[in-house]
Amino acid sequence: MSAEVSTTPAADNVNGTPEATNAAATSAPEVTAVESSSPTSPNNNNQPHSASLYVGELDPSVTEAMLYELFSSIGQVASIRVCRDAVTRRSLGYAYVNYNNTADGERALEDLNYTLIKGKPCRIMWSQRDPALRKTGQGNVFIKNLDSAIDNKALHDTFAAFGNILSCKVAQDEFGNSKGYGFVHYETAEAANNAIKHVNGMLLNDKKVFVGHHISKKDRQSKFDEMKANFTNIYIKNIDPDVTEEEFRKIFEQFGEITSATLSRDPEGKSRGFGFVNYSTHESAQAAVDEMHDKEVKTQKLYVGRAQKKHEREEELRKQYEAARLEKASKYQGVNLYVKNLTDDVDDEKLRELFGPYGTITSAKVMRDSTPAERTETPDSEKEKEVNKENEKKEDEEKAAEEKPKESDEEKKDETKKSDKKLLGKSKGFGFVCFSSPDEASKAVTEMNQRMVNGKPLYVALAQRKDVRRSQLEASIQARNTIRQQQAAAAAGMPQPYMQPAVFYGPGQQGFIPAGQRGGMPFAPQPGMVMGIPGGRPGQYPGPFPGQQGGRGMGPNQQMPPNFQGIPMGAMQGPGGIPNGMGYPQAMGQVQFGRGGGRGQVPGMPMGQGMRGPGYQGRGGPQGGPRPQGGRGQNAAAQPAAGREEAPAGALTAQALNAAAPPQQKQMLGEALYPKIQAQQPELAGKITGMLLEMDNTELLGLLEDDDALRAKVDEALSVYDEYMKNKGEGEAPADADKPKEAAKETATEENKS
């Protein structure tokens, strides 16, 4: 992740004092002697050119103020920067401290290294900006098999006797515990060789340590591949627990000289069923693998193979899992269906019965909670339980009095099934059905999607992986945001082309958008400026269009832009092709509000040259005079004003619906449904519309597209309403549409109970 970094002084100024400079880097500079990169720093003779220190191993809560309080005790601090993540602004655990002179930096490195800050010892070293010097492995020493009690300071004190240390670090896990290995970066290669010569094989805290030159990961990988090809250590599992160490060694001695053989045992001394054998030559190990793999020893078939390290096994298992996952995904591509909106009483068998007619089902599963659902007890259910208990007591007495034969196997199986069903958790309302072929799956989607099952319409679609669903969701959210922006622009009172301000284009330049332009009237035309519209070079219309200097307005045969359909021609014709001051807002008002849309002059906009007062309808039109009714000009009779036409009910799309706010979605659906329902039931159209609006928005969109389904829903709502009226009586007519809705809910509840 990206981070902000304050770097070291770059160069000396005239007075010889280095200047602190700031820069940005994408990651923490690896100046530590770590496994992934092996930095090098110049010797002390070159250090006066830099007075910047790297401070690592910091607690995430450490701030610049805390560091300033500590490092200012040494000398005057030029700047301090704690490096943070560019997005979350959380500390990355390291910082840079820039002093005004190098002597203060040297004193801070000597006195403050491994000082406790917020309970954690900090690690200080000279900062090195040159990555080429940081990543050379010269002088870097690797130490393993360290005792857990050895920390950075103890390691530094141990190896400081062999030369000047630039960096020293013990690797730790996420909990701060030592991983048992570390790195010491010396100033010179001679010091590193001296440390390896004297410390390798010695005891540190009663543990024999290995000390050697650090090998980069790339070189280690090539060496590791060579070791894999010439292995001598083999792993054996599925060993019979009765096999002893002597028997185990004797089984594998026939293939060559064994340097070591061991059986793994638990703390109680019992065999854990696996062991290791190490041969002196690769040929012997390979022969043992070839001969003993899958061979039975004391009725146990052995597994014999090359011994692997833990990280190697984990990587291999990860690859196997990924390959199996991809194979499974390709195998079930187009045949696995996702079904939701299931009622609680639908189980695996019921789901299989529903989709069985469409093909061969390989699996059907209803997803359930991990724990059984607790039934809510009502007074009625408590009474039923008491009655059931009394009946059970009577039955037990009768069974005790009469000797009955043992239950048959079938009865036991039935009871087992019932007990299993009781242990099942509550249904999550969705499941999966897998067919044997894609054709059967597509047929099931076509037939079963939106089908009513137990009073609820099913949603059936092809199952998708989580990452695919996430990408589709992100795309839909982005499209929804785009629609919202377009609707907000339309609400400002301008067609889309005029929503974009005028853009200036210099020779060979992309142009700029003037700041402060809000929705409404466009900029007055100026030389070198064209009106902004989508497509090609933004804001350019083909041919002379209003807004170009010296133009005469729109020609009589010129095609109008898409969003100008419905605007009176007089509103776009005036001297110089400039939209008239009053005609243009009135035309916009007619487009948005239909009759009476004329709004007059925009408040606060002065009447400039080329703009006319009320009633002006283009070049040569009358000025002044009474305005006709409805706010239209005198040309309105000759040219019918294109008011906003009623959109057909079926024009409502899911994309437009999702772009609206949740409270407005039901209103939009109601406005689209009402005309269709009114055509079928003029008297009860309002009540039926209100009843249908209780359904999900996706189902309502489906009804708008399917007249047969809508007719069936209207008939169903009528039957519910008629039943409600019969129960209430003709004299108690409902006062509003809420009562039939309640009746519909009561009827649905009774149907579910039955």
Swiss-Prot record:
Keyword Endoplasmic reticulum: no
Domain RRM: 51-129, 139-216, 232-309, 335-465
Low complexity bias: start-end ranges: 36-46, 634-648
GO CC term (a single one): nucleus
SMART domains (alphabetical): PolyA (SM00517), RRM (SM00360)
Origin: domain of life: Eukaryota
Pfam family, one: RRM_1
CDD domains: RRM1_I_PABPs, RRM2_I_PABPs, RRM3_I_PABPs, RRM4_I_PABPs
Family to which the UniProt record says this protein belongs: Belongs to the polyadenylate-binding protein type-1 family.
Record protein name field: Polyadenylate-binding protein, cytoplasmic and nuclear
Name of the gene encoding the protein in the UniProt record: pab1
